Amino acid sequence: MKQFNDDNFLLQTETAQRLYHDHAAKMPIIDYHCHLIPEYVASDHRFDNLSKIWLEGDHYKWRAMRTNGVDEKYCTGKDTTDWEKFEKWAETVPYTMRNPLYHWTHLELKTAFGVTKLLNPASAREIYDHCTALLQRPEYHARGLMRRYNVEAVCTTDDPVDSLEHHIKVREDGFATRMLPTWRPDKAMAVEVPADFRAYMEKLSEVSGVAITKFADVIDALHVRHEFFGSVGCRLSDHGIEEFYAEDYTQAEIDAIFNKVYGGQTLTPEEIRKFKTAMLVEFATMDHEAGWTQQFHYGAIRNNNSRMFGRLGPDTGFDSIGDFAVGRQMSKFFDMLDRNDRLAKTIIYNLNPRDNELVATMIGNFQDGRYGAGKIQFGSGWWFLDQKDGMEKQMNALSTLGLLSRFVGMLTDSRSFLSYPRHEYFRRTLCNLVGNDIEQGLLPASEIDFIGREIIEGICYRNAKDYFKF
């Protein structure tokens, strides 16, 4: 019987173990998409206790706790103590078996704090006190944890109106880990609520110094901010969309739609889709001109529970996988850009695993050797799919229909400084997948050195470094 969470965790064969320990484990981390709070890195934030670093803002854990019958006050409440919240999490953990939370929890405790005990009500107090004491040491502050996990670069998620002051400070401090911004302009195309859109345009005008009265002014203001982001090291954009937008439109139509929504009038569904199409094309053109990589995270149905959304706001654990029909629109959108030679490097992340083969074949339509290997990427399993089963399905689809060897690999997509073991989890899963193929004679054992050096190390680190030019 294999042991849980030992040095060979998830590695079912000797070949998988060799690939992981000799190749994957030693590679630095490039976390090219995350939601860390930049201020925490700039200030080298010290976390008061284990709850502060582990439970705050973690909607994965909150969903599990709610499902386990835990009252909301122990998830997001303001009147419960940090220990009380942790105690309820510890009560929940034994019931998360076969959920990836069970693996992540114990990997994080082991790799960050050296804790090998299982977290449960009996061990909760000891583990909480031990980890909280360690968190007071400088090597467990925000920057210390990034050093501990050998993080070479992180890309945060930032709005075009953000000052990026914390990124600038980190750069000026000479911190070894590079913290780069990512351009996330979703609010600039969120025209569903005219008052909110107008308020955002006013912010954009203020920070860019461009007076906004017409659509062309919006693009000018965004160009100013795009160039500023580039000056601070930005190399990626990111777009959170339900589906791809690729409507036919004229410039006159977009000008009129902007005037309508900016004037406070509600748009029709057709007008909304046309405007979103135009904005995505403008964003894509900016990225192509700047040599950036654009990312598309699509397919989530957000804020399903209106009662809890009104109480807690977004990103609190009430989102789910959508079932949008996206193939034709995705194809049309990329072709709109490619036929004018304006298609930048692109990473596509689907949330519904139904779309794995769709995305894996779509990326093959728009590869271009002028950009190097793997111009268009099938992104790693995202959100509900960034677990063993989801990652294996994504990699199997990519292997079958594309080139796994040119994959840029894993990212945390996380708000937590304890989430870097997700890279280890991915690397173990990758090595197990490839190692099992070698053991079964599906790949030549004589090529194990090439596989380890070129493919495993490439996917874990080198492909991303070459792709993003960090």
Language model: regions and residue ranges:
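Metal-cofactor-binding active-site regions of metalloenzymes
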Residues: 2-290, 342-344, 348-360, 364-470
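C-terminal amphipathic alpha-helical interaction region
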Residues: 294-296
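Divalent-cation-assisted or electrostatically stabilized phosphate/pyrophosphate-binding catalytic cores
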Residues: 324-330
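A short acidic, glycine-rich active-site loop
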Residues: 268-269, 318-324
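Short glycine/proline- and charge-enriched loop/turn segments
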Residues: 309-317
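Short, basic/hydrophobic alpha-helical segments
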Residues: 333-339
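Hard-cation-handling environments
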Residues: 300, 305
